[in-house]
A protein has these predicted regions:
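Extracytoplasmic/periplasmic solute-binding protein
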Residues: 146-150, 155, 183-201, 206-286
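Short, solvent-exposed loop/beta-turn-alpha elements that line the ligand-binding surface or hinge
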Residues: 120-131, 229-231, 276-298, 346-350, ...
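Conserved C-terminal helix/tail region of periplasmic/extracytoplasmic solute-binding proteins
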Residues: 22, 403-404, 423, 430-480
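Hinge/lid segment of periplasmic solute-binding proteins
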Residues: 102-156, 167, 182-186, 190-193, ...
Length: 480
């Protein structure tokens, strides 16, 4: 225990003196002092740019240092010109960043500049036993694993479970009374089918479930989780049918509202059919932007504005989440951070509802959804003189020290074994498994800004086919 306390104190003292590097001169000025302090043990420097990770990385550094009898010095660096700072420190400092966290879309630039190197993966963790294919593709460049997957972000469907449960009960009651099937929408029919199956099971077991609670009787009707799930729209056709038939509570302003100004929450409409860089995002020949399926998806997207009337210049992700907390909307598109916001609202007493997370709806019954994802990874610096130890720490961080990563940092581990007991995060993981990744190609670094502009214009009624062709021509030219 005494050794652990001394190690923590030592790390804190170092971090207080030099962790945040406001400029290169300040960092270089600390080099001699730090080198003297840690000359007794092999030492590696670990860079990151997100302050939310500070306490967690410091704890991981202490744990790994004690296990291996080495020193890991975390270095928080401004994310402004992060790669350039890494490059300068690698070329001109005696304290080279041995490993660092980087978004997958910057891996080509890092690899070509020598900052990223092929990982050794001595622990044998970079496989589908430990990470989904999406994560492995994200850290692959030109058929080489050049990083370890660490944490990810993607989007999923967030719904007000309280509202949906009440609506499902109404649908089931109509079926029970024999007067609601004719006008029932697709989602309602699914809920009714689930009800019939559940009630049949209930009859076969004396009308009780495994816990002894009554499933259905003449006087009461209990809605099961399966029936609620059956009522969640699987595509936008079902979403529109739901909206047409939904008898909304007084404070509900919209059935569906999301941030239509941000490509991260729009991409799922076209993600399954738009190709930029191939599976690993590094193939200049794999580009297919303007095809019939993408055009159909964008037409669906454009038509939704006629139904949901979302003003792109006045909506934001934060405003949508607040509307959801206030009970003004039934469904929205959200990223993993929403779980923390809802938990906080619950604790403050401002969110009196239950909620659920589901897979994103397809654009139509025939067209499939595919969300966008970003994978932050741990890179071993090609300039490092301690690459073996840096690889060990990267493997430790991504495959051993992931417990409570989300609770302490808000970041969701890409490791399949993480968050096993969190149902909401497991749904996000399922979405991540099927998601597309940001491409790594330097020439397409502005693609997402251009695609976001395209979505904005399509939402406002401009010709989708023409805009797609313009974007396709522009990206093709950039890659030549």
């Amino acid at each position: 225990m005494r050794k652990r306390l001394l190690a923590v104190l030592l790390i804190v003292c170092v971090m207080a003196g030099m962790l945040y590097l406001g400029n290169e001169n300040e960092y270089v000025g600390k080099e001699e002092e730090i080198s003297t302090l840690f000359r007794d043990k092999e030492t590696i420097y670990f860079w990151y740019s997100d302050e939310a990770l500070t306490d967690f990385i410091a704890s991981a550094a202490v744990a790994f240092g004690e296990e291996k009898d080495v020193r890991v010095i975390p270095v928080l660096t401004s994310d402004s010109e992060y790669l350039e700072a890494l490059n300068q420190a690698s070329l001109h400092s005696t304290q080279i960043p041995d490993a660092f966290i980087l978004s997958n879309d910057s891996l080509e630039k890092a690899y070509l500049s020598g900052l990223a190197s092929r990982i050794t993966d001595e622990a044998g963790i970079c496989n589908e036993e430990h990470f989904p294919g999406t994560a492995l593709s994200a850290v692959t460049y030109k058929d080489k694993l050049v990083a370890y997957p660490y944490y990810y972000e993607t989007s999923a469907l967030l719904y007000n479970k309280t509202y949906l449960e009440a609506w499902t009960a109404e649908q089931l009651q109509k079926v029970a009374e024999g007067d609601g099937e004719e006008g029932m929408d697709d989602a309602g029919e699914d809920a009714a089918d689930a009800s019939a199956a559940d009630n049949a099971d209930a009859s076969a077991t004396d009308d009780t479930d495994a816990s002894g609670e009554m499933e259905a009787t003449e006087d009461t009707l209990t809605v099961t989780p399966e029936q609620i799930a059956a009522g969640i729209p699987a595509n936008m056709d079902e979403m529109l049918a739901f909206a047409d038939n939904y008898d909304a509570p007084e404070n509900v302003e919209a059935v569906l509202r999301w941030d239509v100004s941000d490509i991260f929450y729009n991409y799922f409409f076209v993600g399954n059919y738009m190709v930029v860089g191939g599976e690993c995002g590094d193939d200049e020949t794999a580009v297919d932007i303007s095809n019939e399926a993408v055009k159909q998806c964008l037409q669906v997207y454009q038509n939704l504005n006629q139904f949901f009337y979302i003003e792109s210049d006045s909506v934001s992700y934060d405003s949508v989440v607040q509307d959801f907390i206030d009970g003004k909307i039934v469904f929205t598109i959200a990223t993993t951070d929403v779980l923390t916001k809802l938990k906080q609202a619950k604790e403050e007493g401002t969110f009196p509802y239950e909620y659920g997370i589901a897979m994103l709806p397809g654009p139509s019954a025939e067209l499939q959804a595919k969300s966008l994802s970003v994978t932050n990874c741990v890179v071993v610096n090609g300039y490092s003189e301690h690459r073996a130890l840096a690889n060990e720490f990267a493997a430790f961080l991504t495959n051993e020290y992931y417990d409570n990563l989300y609770e302490r940092t808000g970041k969701v581990s890409a490791n399949l074994a993480a968050n096993a007991g969190n149902e909401d995060l497991q749904v996000f993981m399922e979405e991540y498994k099927h998601a597309g990744s940001l491409p790594k190609m330097i020439e397409t670094s502005n693609f997402w800004i251009q695609l976001e502009i395209l979505f904005s214009k399509v939402w406002e009624g401009e010709d989708a086919a023409g805009l797609l062709q313009e974007l396709s021509d522009r990206i093709t030219t950039q890659l030549q």
